[in-house]
Amino acid sequence: MALSKTAQPMQSSLRKIAVVVATAVSGMSAYAHAAETPKKEETITVTAAPAPQESAWGPAATIAARQSATGTKTDTSIEKVPQSISVVTAEEMALHQPRSVKEALSYTPGVAVGTRGASNTYDYLIIRGFAADGQSQNNYLDGMKMQGNFYNDAVIDPYMIERAEVMRGPTSVLYGKSSPGGLLNMVSKRPLTEPLKEVQFKVGTDSLFQTGFDFSDALDDDGVYSYRLTGLARSNNAQQERAEEQRYTIAPSFSWRPSDKTNFTFLSYFQNEPETGYYGWLPKEGTVDPLPNGDRLPTDFNEGAKNNTYSRNQKMVGYSFDHEFNDTFTVRQNLRFAENKTSQNSVYGYGVCSDAANSGNALCNALSPADKGHYLARKYVVDDEKLQNFTVDTQLQSKFATGDVDHILLTGVDYMRMRNDINAWFGYDASVPLLDLYNPVYSDFDFDSKNPANSGPYQLLNKQQQTGLYVQDQAQWNKVLVTLGGRYDWAEQDSFNRVTGTTASRDDNQFTWRGGVNYLFDNGVTPYFSYSESFEPSSQSDAQGKPFAPSKGKQYEVGVKYVPGDRPIVLTGALYQLTKTNNLMADPAGSFFSVEGGEIRARGVEIEAKAALSASVNVVGSYTYTDVEYTTDTNYKGNTPAQVPEHMASLWGDYTFYDGALSGLTLGTGGRFSSSSYGDPANSFKVGSYAVMDALVR
């Protein structure tokens, strides 16, 4: 059994102290007042104030969130969404102490988070057996896509968000172009009208040093104006030697609430990462399989050059606005402008010299057959990118009734524009020395000679646009809830090659829809059935230079949810079949180009439990079964896609003491299991199963 190399933090939180003191003062004040004027036969009636209504865009009181907007774009109870939704609250993240959002999803069903090992450079996810097309993430912040391109993807620190939500299955009916497996949506921390004062310090293994703060309060007596200021600074070594992670983040926000019907919130996010950590490729020789001499590589092995660097800078500004005209009509608008810059100088592994992919490497061909099995071929990349992204989503929500049927009708239009300026050079030549895995010798690489500012074969200006019109009706008659929605998208992409002076363009128009039925029993049990669709444009072209048509996803899902009204418990189970058509595959004629027509089918079962059993006890558990297969493909028909484990399971529990000498102490432990998965689509080798144990003392 392997232990994770996640640091075990020591944390000090001023927020907990403030809560305890405030409670004690409040209690003494009430007691003193009652003692002032004792009366005979006095009857005192105590009425508990109702708990504040949870909002899909705000904090949840426990680890078991009951509301979400990710699945409907409206503030909807989880049991009323006809698809699988998982919510990881800030409370749960505080228990697990993740260093990335993908780590925060480690106990979430249907999501494979460890496809790049311990690397936290990106939050790449495989959901229900599918990853996003190309290198881009399928991640959203406050309901708007953080559109990435090439190596330029934004990453949000988990300390800066209130929720991380995963919607599994096709989502194009609400969000447009998307991976068929699902998406991740993060909800930013927002201003509060009650005082919040938190300062934290962490130290841990891998030379972890972190400090963070989270302040919020109203700026006036009426709570019309409020602010929130959240920040973090962290430095730690990555698991691989000679790799470091540094992050400095601050997120100021401001809210204006002139009435209980109007809310305007300014949101911003600024993050600088001088070093994003390790992002390379380890060979199967020495990791999955032993080297020819029987040895294995150390767990901190790094195949890169001594002077590898990978930095990123992010800036985001925007707002969230909503206004309730009356009991029927509410308008909402979310808007954001983002700018991301990445700079990378990296040497990375490309398999041992005996691999067929390295048959054209002159350095490999100079070796004897016996040596090819322990010499690692390497490539380099020199890359500078500047990406700008603008997104706006405007919605009109209408609540009304037609006879005995209550409706929540949502109509909306959203627009996204992305521009990424790429200057890159990559490949391998005699200047990239081989690495002897028996006795690796590291040196600096002359990246300046490959500087793309001077010249480079990969100088592109990539542009993407998407406009979508959508409508959705949540119609409830007694205990039957029908959700029906449709969307039409206009998607454009252009790639201008500065080297050749040519432009490749592709326009796609696509209609997608979703239908679902839920039956709401009085005891909190809700069975449901749904059908949903997705589409995902391709950036590749055929042998004649014609861009490929989008791939499409179709899913049938049946499940049951248990969300009792009087207890913080969420239990869900789902059974689904998901098919991706028009997947790209190798040309049967043997050319180096791909062709359309491939198909991948996924079937699976997912079970999740989240429960705050008492004020002291939390339990989180999940199980995932995923059966994915290339049903139509030139080379891989019948095979399983890479990096998709058949089984995953997790269980977590924690206990907080509220009395005695241990009052305020929280103890927790958990475990995660993943079965083996194939390392390539040819299914030529497997990466073994593993189990990881987690522990908490706070």
Task: Name each model-derived stretch.
Residues 159-162, 173-252, 256-262, 315, ...:
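Outer-membrane beta-barrel translocator/receptor signature
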Residues 234-238, 251-257, 261-324, 339-387, ...:
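Acidic/polar loop-and-plug regions of large Gram-negative outer-membrane beta-barrel proteins
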Residues 255-259, 387, 406-418, 460-580:
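Structural signature of Gram-negative outer-membrane beta-barrels, strongest in the C-terminal barrel
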Residues 3, 41-195, 199, 534, ...:
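Acidic, small-polar-rich N-terminal luminal/periplasmic segments of exported/outer-membrane proteins
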Residues 317-339, 378-496:
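Face-selective signature of the C-terminal outer-membrane beta-barrel domain
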Residues 322-324, 330-336, 340-348, 527, ...:
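Membrane-embedded beta-barrel scaffold of Gram-negative outer-membrane proteins
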Residues 479, 577, 596-681:
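Gram-negative outer-membrane beta-barrel transporters
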